[in-house]
UniProtKB/Swiss-Prot annotation:
Signal peptide: none
Function according to Swiss-Prot or TrEMBL: One of several proteins that assist in the late maturation steps of the functional core of the 30S ribosomal subunit. Associates with free 30S ribosomal subunits (but not with 30S subunits that are part of 70S ribosomes or polysomes). Required for efficient processing of 16S rRNA. May interact with the 5'-terminal helix region of 16S rRNA.
GO cellular component, one term: cytosol
Protein family per UniProt: Belongs to the RbfA family.
Keyword Cytoplasm listed: yes
GO molecular-function terms, A-Z: ribosomal small subunit binding
The protein's name in its UniProt record: Ribosome-binding factor A
């Protein structure tokens, strides 16, 4: 039973954090495309790790990450207002590079396939 509740809480917090980032944070440094890939709330609801994927050049990524990290207080306050939980979790922003790694692997597989077709 607790597994399902944790999953529902993770999804609800993920949805709200995504809405907050895209609609409510007015930081000009948040210029790159940012997407929330996953949220992991601890069982005691004290911490919420928010995994974000940031697209853009390295400078835009760093600026966007700094903007998100400086907005964690606002994000936490909005989560507390929007999601009905006994404790509002402390938000921890983590960068998720899995999408970029997946794209890199896809490019490698595509180049291998091209090399094999050229050899035949």
């Amino acid at each position: 039973m607790a597994k399902y509740r944790a999953g529902r809480i993770n999804e609800e917090v993920k949805k709200e954090v995504s809405n907050i980032i895209h609609n409510d944070i007015k930081d000009p440094r948040l210029s790159a495309m940012v997407s929330v890939t996953d949220v992991d709330v601890t069982k005691d609801l004290k911490y919420a790790k928010v995994y974000v994927s940031i697209f853009g050049n390295e400078k835009a990524k760093e600026e966007s990450l700094q903007a998100l990290k400086s907005s964690v207080g606002f994000i936490r306050k909005e989560i507390g207002r929007r999601v009905k939980l006994r404790n509002t979790p402390e938000v921890i922003i983590e960068v998720d590079n899995s999408i970029e790694r997946g794209m890199h692997i896809d490019e490698l597989l595509h180049s291998i396939k091209e090399n094999e077709s050229n050899d035949n």
